[in-house]
């Protein structure tokens, strides 16, 4: 069974990762030495706890973004994703099929002037079977 990590350990590990991400890795012993060099940690026990949590977070960061930690590389990647513009606009198609409700919404948003809209009746959803037997 694991132990609960204190606020001090978590905060220190996050700050260390944000500032010294390039010097850290997945190895506890190297992370321990880096923590020892860059921070004034009062006890050996606390240093080991921080280094252990740094190692844990580094493994999580490799799998994907971690909440509460902003790293320059991840920030740039997020910017690229947010600023993505498709090659061909969805509005440049010859005919855009929409249902009557969507047509009304487009009219309210001042897109009613689109000439290539074609109103079609929506297809009825799938026929789900009613449950049999006692409920």
UniProtKB/Swiss-Prot annotation:
One of its GO terms (biological process) is translation. There is a cross-link at residue 103 (Glycyl lysine isopeptide (Lys-Gly) (interchain with G-Cter in SUMO1)). Its main location: cytoplasm. It comes from the Eukaryota. The keyword Hydrolase does not apply. GO terms for cellular component: cytoplasm; cytosol; cytosolic ribosome; cytosolic small ribosomal subunit; focal adhesion; membrane; nucleolus; nucleoplasm. The modification N6-succinyllysine is found at residue 19. It is found in: Cytoplasm; Nucleus, Nucleolus. The modification Phosphothreonine is found at residue 130. There is a cross-link at residue 103 (Glycyl lysine isopeptide (Lys-Gly) (interchain with G-Cter in SUMO2)). The modification Phosphoserine is found at residue 113. Coiled coil: none annotated. GO terms for molecular function: RNA binding; structural constituent of ribosome. HAMAP family: Ribosomal_eS17. Component of the small ribosomal subunit. Part of the small subunit (SSU) processome, composed of more than 70 proteins and the RNA chaperone small nucleolar RNA (snoRNA) U3. It is linked to Diamond-Blackfan anemia 4: A form of Diamond-Blackfan anemia, a congenital non-regenerative hypoplastic anemia that usually presents early in infancy. Diamond-Blackfan anemia is characterized by a moderate to severe macrocytic anemia, erythroblastopenia, and an increased risk of developing leukemia. 30 to 40% of Diamond-Blackfan anemia patients present with short stature and congenital anomalies, the most frequent being craniofacial (Pierre-Robin syndrome and cleft palate), thumb and urogenital anomalies. Component of the small ribosomal subunit. The ribosome is a large ribonucleoprotein complex responsible for the synthesis of proteins in the cell. Part of the small subunit (SSU) processome, first precursor of the small eukaryotic ribosomal subunit. During the assembly of the SSU processome in the nucleolus, many ribosome biogenesis factors, an RNA chaperone and ribosomal proteins associate with the nascent pre-rRNA and work in concert to generate RNA folding, modifications, rearrangements and cleavage as well as targeted degradation of pre-ribosomal RNA by the RNA exosome. This is Small ribosomal subunit protein eS17. It comes from Homo sapiens (Human). The lineage of its organism: Eukaryota, Metazoa, Chordata, Craniata, Vertebrata.
